[in-house]
Amino acid sequence: MALQSNGQIKISDIKTELGSTDNSLEALSNDAGFTAPHAMSDFYGYSAGASNLYYWNFGENDGGASFTGNAGTSPGPFSFSLWIKPSWAASDTNVLLFEINANNGNNTDRLMLIYDYGFNRLVFRYRAGSSNHHLNWALNQNAASGNIGRWHGSSRGPVNSDGFAHIAGTFDPTQTSAANGLKLYWNGTAFNTTITQANGTRANFAKTHMYINVAFNGNGDRNAEYDNIAFWFNRLLTSSQISTLYNSGAPITAGDAGLATGLGFEAAAEGTSLVDDTGNWTNVSAGGSRSTY
């Protein structure tokens, strides 16, 4: 339910709309995705449940998207959330849904989520130097992903009415065991069966380059649609907050979910180009185009 468009708005009204217990206007404004100077009038007509109108459509081998920025060197805590509709062919191999790295060109210092088509698994990995810290989840062994045999345009698993799945994850680098520190969710439901893990170092590295929807071997990208790609570089989301982002299948921004605090990157595809709405990262290139739901 949207807030009123004129007249007096109360802090209590804003708290109810955001589902927040905070009494600070600045904190509430940040959670809604507004910037300074913070004013009550920013909330005229605001709705925490506003749905998106557009998504980003990548064609096969049109380059994916790349950004430059600076998320510091700390390994975390780190959280991500994105919506994806795979349209790649059943013959494709590996897809990097995202990668954040130090741009050193030697396959080290990378934070990533990979879909390995050959083994039908999602791999959430923090790679510091040549040391991997990761978990692998087989899609055919997890009810959250519908136990699908392969993930592609004709086998998407559980999706919303537009064919999109919500994928989210968290990384707690204070945990030496990857099984304790890495979590993955599909449509707000946690994966509970892992197949392999590596408990490598969680050392610092610079996080200055970001890639969305690129082939793991560097040969272009995959045919897929994305929306609301968000990263928190110093915040560990709870399972309840991830459920809020899932929003019963309706993509919303982090601000609409009341989770803008600590947000380091968000591309919601509502503009004419794929840009970081937080202003922290600069778009270097983006293949594909905006499409209407």
Where are these regions (language model features)?
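N-terminal low-complexity, intrinsically disordered "leader/linker" segments enriched in small/polar
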Residues: 2-53, 241-248, 259-264, 271
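Extended recognition patches within non-cytosolic domains
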Residues: 52-54, 228-293
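Extracellular glycan-recognition modules
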Residues: 57-132, 175-179, 216, 233-242
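Short edge-strand/loop segments of extracellular domains
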Residues: 99-109, 183-191, 250-252
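Short, aromatic/His-centered strand-loop micro-motif at the edge of beta-sheets
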Residues: 127-166
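Localized edge beta-strand/strand-to-loop motifs within extracellular or lumenal beta-rich domains
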Residues: 163-182
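Short, solvent-exposed beta-strand-to-loop segments that form ligand-recognition rims
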Residues: 186-209
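Extracellular glycan-interaction patches encoded by glycine-rich segments
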Residues: 204-227, 236, 248
